[in-house]
Swiss-Prot record:
It comes from the Bacteria. It comes from Escherichia coli O127:H6 (strain E2348/69 / EPEC). This is Protein Ves. PANTHER family: PROTEIN VES (PTHR37943:SF1). Belongs to the Ves family. Signal peptide: none annotated.
Amino acid sequence: MEYFDMRKMSVNLWRNAAGETREICTFPPAKRDFYWRASIASIAANGEFSLFPGMERIVTLLEGGEMFLESADRFNHTLKPLQPFAFAADQVVKAKLTAGQMSMDFNIMTRLDVCKAKVRIAERTFTTFGSRGGVVFVINGAWQLGDKLLTTDQGACWFDGRHTLRLLQPQGKLLFSEINWLAGYSPDQVQ
C-alpha cells in the first residue's frame, strides 16, 4: 500500500508547456514499460494527449471547466466533472478547454493485452475485491483505509489485496479505479 497527498507530490512539466503531471503510481513499480499507471494532470492550454501505443486511457475531470475531446473521425466528447471516459491511448486526441480555464483530471492507463481498469465515484463505504490493484483519490470528505485517515486530495494505491474504505462523515466522494487482470495474468506473474 502506498499513500499520497497531491499537494506534496512532485510535478513534471509537459514539454509543450500546456500542463503538468503528478504521477501517483506505476505497476510494476519504477518501470518505464508499465502495465498500468495512475496520474493527475493539470491542463492549462489546448493541446494533444501523449500517445501510448497498446494502452487504454480513462480520464476523469476532477475540477475546472469542461474539456472537449476530439479524435479525428473516431469521437467528439465533452468531458464533464466526475464522469470517466475511456479511449485508446494510441490515437491522436485533442483537448480543448471549453471555458478557457485550467482543468485537473485523473488518468489511469492500462496495457490492453494485460489488464483493464474501471473507474467509478464512490459516495459510501465499500470493500474492494481481493487480488486486484487499485487507486483511490479523495474528492471530499474523510475516509478510513486501514489505520490511515484520507481527506481531500489524498489517496492510496495498491497492487493486490482486499481493502475497505469507510466513509466517516455523512457525505463524501472518492474516485476509485480498480485494475482487473486479463486471463493468464496476475500481479505476481508480471512483476
